[in-house]
């Protein structure tokens, strides 16, 4: 079996560093297991229905913590780690796109507008 290409974002490392040591160890174990076989049933690679971006999934670290992953072609990018609900809330606000000019993956917050944007009363000059 080929090893999956797994990348780790700086935000993932920062989020992991803020978790208890015991959880950090579990994250390391999971990353190694994920690299060897991302389709392993023990990883619980699952779609997050609340996400705007359908390429974002969760992986189970333990009963309490989840990792957030985006799959772009044959590369998995680990984005975030947090308590289950907080991780899902974080993921629901994100979108990932490949920059057409640089080829790099960009992760950004999605904002929703609660009111329609008013039409301009005067025509625009340009």
Question: What are the roles of these predicted feature ranges?
Answer:
Residues 1-3, 57, 61-126:
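Enriched for short, Lys/Arg-rich terminal
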Residues 14-17, 32:
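Surface-exposed alpha-helical segments enriched in charged/polar residues
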Residues 32-59:
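A short, surface-exposed loop/turn module that caps and links secondary-structure elements
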Residues 2-15, 26, 45:
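N-terminal "first-domain core" detector
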């Amino acid at each position: 079996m080929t090893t999956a290409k797994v990348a780790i974002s700086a935000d993932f490392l920062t989020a992991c560093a803020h978790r208890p040591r015991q959880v950090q160890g579990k994250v390391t174990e999971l990353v190694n297991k994920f690299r060897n076989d991302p389709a392993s049933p023990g990883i619980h690679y699952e779609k997050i229905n609340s996400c705007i971006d359908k390429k974002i999934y969760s992986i189970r670290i333990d009963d309490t913590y989840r990792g957030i992953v985006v799959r772009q072609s044959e590369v998995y990018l680990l984005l975030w780690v947090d308590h289950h609900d907080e991780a899902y809330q974080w993921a629901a606000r994100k979108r990932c796109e490949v920059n057409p000019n640089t080829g790099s993956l960009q992760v950004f917050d999605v904002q929703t507008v609660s009111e329609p944007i008013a039409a301009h009363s005067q025509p625009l000059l340009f």
